[in-house]
Structures are given as structure tokens and as C-alpha cells.
Amino acid sequence: MKNLLVAQSGGPTSAINATLAGVIENALSSPSVDKIYGSVNGIQGVLNENLIDLKTKITNVSELNLLCQTPASALGSCRVKLKDPAVCADEYETIISVLRKYSIDCFIYIGGNDSMDTVDKLSKYLSDKGITDITVVGAPKTIDNDLCGTDHCPGFGSAAKYIGTTFAELERDCHVYTTKAVTIVEVMGRDAGWLTAASCLARATGAKGPDFIYLCEVPFSIDTFLKDVKAKLEEQDAVIIAVSEGVKNKDGRYISEEVQSSAVDSFGHSYIAGAAKVLEDAVRNEIGCKVRSIELNLMQRCAAHLASATDIQESRMLGKAACQYALEGAGGMMAAVIRTSNKPYATEFKALPVCDIANAIKSVPADYINDAGNDVTEKMVDYLTPLIQGEMNTVYENGIPKYIYLY
């Protein structure tokens, strides 16, 4: 019999708990699994020995389904970066000690790029130490959709659905007046513009906007931006713009640097924000029309009420696949989504070496972006559309979606 540990890390999503549900579901149905532990607050919970017995928290299918519709990370999260073991191996030895104490054979870590870095480092350390009876497997999660190897990341489809819907609603609101006005919406995405690109989905509802989509893959010029806006204002009263939070100028500097914090997180990433605000000020100063900036911020990653059924179902199945890989001893691997067909849409799951995925960025391909660098092409629309299909049969309580708490 095997004991299994699962944890979540990084930024929450609307689908990360569906992946957790898939892990638990597979483990509960496996005759080879005895205990199922959850680490509270990711790898930090392992280091602090803050583990809970998930068999006492999830006891039936209804609770598994409820977990799938619960946003954010039900086990909590963390931003802990493991040190290079060649410099300091203390954390690794602590982790192994805790895993040994609870007789854990399989550890599944659900998270994004930095979490896959943890899976990679821990797997290599175990291998270097000749420890073969502990298997570490990664399960992808990130609304940024910037993990390599996988066609798309669990959580991205739901965030894309929310963003497309939000732009469709904003477009209708902005066009009710005849006053010249510009609305600039900042979308998450430090290193890749996938989320911002999802704003194009609003056009499927008949919306003309967003009028411009600026991704961080394209060097950004405020002068060119202002020319775009001025030209569009000559054609229509309202202009709606989507911009990635991580847009940079030709010198590689964030345009938002003048308003961003100098602080960085534990992985060395700058806390960036304010791109839309910088552009709002530029429009106000150079064009002089009515202008507002909107930052979607956390809403785009926790709007479970608008989750994509495709995303949630795939995320749950991916969790089951990751659990199976762990039980089969496929250490140092990540469960990936492989798109086998677009029309009709179909996917399968595959275990890929996490060493080829960790610390790499999947950028938006050049042929998904128009020549002017201010919009996306039909290839992007074709890529995105299947990921947002379907709606969840959400359970409500007193008029509000019902959620589950694990700790």
C-alpha cells in the first residue's frame, strides 16, 4: 500500500481544485493507496509538517464535485523557492524527513512554472541521493498559460472565458455614449500575452472591440500606441484597449516601471502593475479625451462562477493522470495536455520530463499576432475557442455558489 501527498502552489485559479479533485478521486479508487495527505500552503506546509488527512475531508462524490467548483487553492498556496541543493541541502533533507515520517511514496505538486522548478529540483535531489521509493510528479496550473510542453494549462480556459465575457460586457457599456472616450483594460501576464489575447473572444458575441490588443511579446511604443488611438477616435467615439501587464519597450523595460514597486517575490519576479495607468495618463496628456483604466487583477483568476466546463473537466482528468503517473513511479515528470484535434476538439494526457519544462516560458507564437503588433490573428481565435466551451452546473446555497473548505 502507498501513501500519497498532494499540494498546491503559485497563483490560484478557478480550476486548480478540479485538478486536486482528480488526484483525490484516483487515489480513493486505487486499491494500492492507503493514506491521502494534503500539504497546507504548498511545499512550505511540507517543511513545516502542516499536513491534513484528505480522506476525512472528502468522503463522497458530491464533495469532490463541490471541490471542482470552488475557486482559488483549497489547500492554500505559497511562494517558496527551494535553494540550490549544492549551496544548501537543509530544506531537501527536511522534506525527505517529513515524507519518511508519514511513509509517503508519492508527492504530486500542482502549480505553475516555479512549482515545476520545485518538482525538478526535488526529483533530481532524490535521484542524486539514490532514493528510488519516493516519486515526485508535477501537475500544471497557471492562468498565464506559459508552461511549455502542454498545449494549454488548466485554469487558463476559465480565465480566458472570464476575460472574453468581461470585454463583451464592457464594449456594450462603453458604446452607449457619444462622448469621445478611451477605456484601457490591463490583463495579467508578466511574460506571456495569452490572457490578454483572450480579450478577442468578445468579438464572437458581435462586439467590435477590443479595438487594440497589445501583448508583451511585441515591443511596445507609447508613441505608436497614441497614433493607433488617435486614428481610431477619428472613426468612432469609444475605443477599448486590452494590454498585458508585462508590456515592455524596445529596450526591454516595463512601461509601468515608473509606478511599480521595486520589490520582488521569492523567485526574483518584479511586482509589476500600472501599465494601463501609465497609458491612461499618456492619453489624457496627449489626446485630452475622457479616459479610464481598469485593472482586472484577481477577478480574472478566481471567477469560478464563469468557469469553462471544458477547463474544469480537463483539469480533473489531468489530476487523475498525474496521480496515476505518480503511482506508476514516473518521477520527475509533469502531466501535460496534448491537443490531438481542433475540430472536433480532442485532447489526451502525456507524462513529460519536468526538466524540459521548468524555468522556460511558452510565448505567444508570432503568427498568432498581426503584423502591426496591435491585435491577434484568426489562429489565436481558433486556438482559444475550444478552451472556453461549456458551463458548469454550479450548486448554489442562499443564492451564492457553494464552496468547500479543507482546513
Model-derived segments and their meaning:
Residues 13-23, 46-47, 83, 91-93, ...:
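Short glycine/serine/threonine-rich phosphate/pyrophosphate-binding segments
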Residues 257-407:
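C-terminal non-catalytic interaction/assembly regions of soluble proteins
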Residues 2-6, 67-81, 141-151, 178-181, ...:
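Gly-rich Lys/Arg/Thr-decorated short loops/hinges at beta-loop-alpha junctions or inter-strand turns
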Residues 3-13, 73-79, 105-111, 138, ...:
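Short glycine-rich or small-residue beta-strand-to-loop segments that form or flank ligand, phosphate
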Residues 49-105, 114, 143, 154-156, ...:
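Glycine-rich oxoanion-binding loops at beta->alpha junctions
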Residues 98, 106-111, 117-133, 153-292:
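Accessory alpha-helical/coil subdomains and C-terminal extensions
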Residues 9-11, 39-45, 79-80, 112-113, ...:
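Short, ordered loop/turn segments at secondary-structure junctions
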Residues 1-51:
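N-terminal phosphate-binding or glycine-rich loops at protein starts, especially the Walker A/P-loop
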